[in-house]
From Swiss-Prot:
Recorded GO MF terms: alanine racemase activity; pyridoxal phosphate binding
Species, as recorded: Staphylococcus aureus (strain Mu50 / ATCC 700699)
GO cellular component, one term: cytosol
Function of the molecule: Catalyzes the interconversion of L-alanine and D-alanine.
Protein name (record): Alanine racemase 1
Pathway(s): Amino-acid biosynthesis; D-alanine biosynthesis; D-alanine from L-alanine: step 1/1
Residues involved in substrate binding: 138, 312
NCBIfam families assigned: alr
Gene: alr1
Catalytic activity: L-alanine = D-alanine
Amino acid sequence: MSDKYYRSAYMNVDLNAVASNFKVFSTLHPNKTVMAVVKANAYGLGSVKVARHLMENGATFFAVATLDEAIELRMHGITAKILVLGVLPAKDIDKAIQHRVALTVPSKQWLKEAIKNISGEQEKKLWLHIKLDTGMGRLGIKDTNTYQEVIEIIQQYEQLVFEGVFTHFACADEPGDMTTEQYQRFKDMVNEAIKPEYIHCQNSAGSLLMDCQFCNAIRPGISLYGYYPSEYVQQKVKVHLKPSVQLIANVVQTKTLQAGESVSYGATYTATDPTTIALLPIGYADGYLRIMQGSFVNVNGHQCEVIGRVCMDQTIVKVPDQVKAGDSVILIDNHRESPQSVEVVAEKQHTINYEVLCNLSRRLPRIYHDGDQRFVTNELLK
């Protein structure tokens, strides 16, 4: 990736905040392996830089959604353990073995097909984590008998290693009994067979709210980056997480709309008086969505309204007269109390903080801050 960029919109990523959040989980669960979830490009932050920094701060295990994500980490020197949480097509099993990546076993049928596709040339081990469906209703084995049968199949092959078993909570970020019921179901199933090296069920919410002594690993995702999975979780815990992302754009032009003049597609905003506007080089192609019309951004400490429709590449803001080209504008802030916090943006978009971060597109350069050091990655100029 290039360390150069040629546009006036970018993300700031605070690596020290990410490391601090990782240490929060290490402290909460001192006897458990923290499987840092860096899928979806580390929730938009940039998986390679984040994984490297976490390794420097003690991370030994990562989780991703796809083999492609795992291979990307391997290609950039990430040597720690990696688990693919999603389903790999059985025909591609040799690639996982080649790159020393652990895989999820979602069903007995998948395991049988995967074994058929292991070439005779492969002598390396294949680490497997069996997924149990305890109530999420997605991937995984639902009954104890099938779980035991899958373990027996794995044990028939010297090359295969039954390394882990896990489940995923559906409602850990909400009040109610379902999470407790899932956890009990998980324990009951796992206790009916031999236990692997890793037993894990806690996502970010589960890791913040539950002890789960039966398990010896946790899988925090969104909260590694400084964000609570829900308002309910934030209110229930005393743990302080540090938000790690800012979205910045610099004004590229200012101009004055006269009374009666409109701006942007559909002419949805018409000035009633002479109005100074600032044009920002960012739009919905960057993940700053059309629905953000009517929201507010921070321009030199002033809360300024987004007017007119957000375009693919440009956003228009009503600003004080003294604003000029080059001024910095905060669209997403890394302070939880800010009117531009990820949570405020998520509420405006009628979604969750996860989606806001994941929507921030690859064409935005990422500027990483590690104390006094600064690094840039630009995926468009690889």
